[in-house]
Amino acid sequence: MLSSIKCVLVGDSAVGKTSLLVRFTSETFPEAYKPTVYENTGVDVLMDGIQISLGLWDTAGNDAFRSIRPLSYQQADVVLMCYSVANHNSFLNLKNKWIGEVRSNLPCTPVLVVATQTDQREVGPHRASCVNAIEGKRLAQDVRAKGYLECSALSNRGVQQVFECAVRTAVNQARRRNRRRFFSINECKIL
C-alpha cells in the first residue's frame, strides 16, 4: 500500500483548480482569484484505516508556463484534469491539449476528469450553456480516464469525493503494478 501519493491538477486557467485545493485542505473558499504559477501542499488522509500523505500539486493553466509544468508531473501517482462546466473552451481543451500533455509526460499514470464550478449550472449567468454531465462522462471515456467526477468548491459539493477517488485510484493502480511485478518475477516455466 502506498504511504504517500502525488496528485497533480491540470486544466485551463481560472477553472477552479486552486479553489478546489483550498476547499479540500482548509475548508474555506478563496473569494479573490489569484493565478497560480506553481504551488504544492499536502494533507494526511485516511483510507481503509491507513494514513496516507497526499501531496497536491497545483499547476498553472496559462501557456506561458508550459515549459515548467512538466516539473510537477515527475513521479505523479494520479492526475486530475479539470474543466469548468461554465467554460466550454476549458472542456474542449481537455481533449485538444491537456490529455496529450499529460500522456506524453505520464503515459501510465491514471487520469480522472473533474468538472468544476457545477454551482454555475444553477445560479450562474452561463447556466443555459453549461457543459452537462453526459458530455463530461463521454469526454472521460474518450480520453480513457479512470473516472469522471463533478464538484463545486463554492458550495463544497463533491470536493471530498474527488480526492477520495484520486487516492483510491492511485492505490488501486499501485496494487495492480505490484501484482504484475510479483507475477513477472515468479513466473513458472514448463520445459
Curated annotation (Swiss-Prot):
A lipid is attached at C188 (S-geranylgeranyl cysteine). PROSITE patterns: RHO. Its main location: cytoplasm. GO terms for cellular component: cytoplasm; plasma membrane. InterPro entries: P-loop_NTPase (IPR027417), Small_GTP-bd (IPR005225), Small_GTPase (IPR001806), Small_GTPase_Rho (IPR003578). Residues 189-191 form a propeptide. Residues 73-86 are annotated as: Interaction with ZAP70. It is found in: Cytoplasm; Cell membrane. The keyword ATP-binding does not apply. The modification Cysteine methyl ester is found at C188. A motif (Effector region) lies at residues 33-41. GO terms for biological process: actin filament organization; signal transduction; small GTPase-mediated signal transduction. Binds GTP but lacks intrinsic GTPase activity and is resistant to Rho-specific GTPase-activating proteins. Inhibits the activation of NF-kappa-B by TNF and IKKB and the activation of CRK/p38 by TNF. Inhibits activities of RAC1, RHOA and CDC42. Negatively regulates leukotriene production in neutrophils. Negative regulator of hematopoietic progenitor cell proliferation, survival and migration. Critical regulator of thymocyte development and T-cell antigen receptor (TCR) signaling by mediating recruitment and activation of ZAP70. Belongs to the small GTPase superfamily. Rho family. Interacts with GDI1 and GDI2. Interacts with ZAP70 (via SH2 domains) and the interaction is enhanced by its phosphorylation by LCK. Interacts with SYK and the interaction is enhanced by its phosphorylation by FYN. The region involved in interaction with ZAP70 is a non-canonical immunoreceptor tyrosine-based activation motif (ITAM). This is Rho-related GTP-binding protein RhoH. It comes from Bos taurus (Bovine). The lineage of its organism: Eukaryota, Metazoa, Chordata, Craniata, Vertebrata.
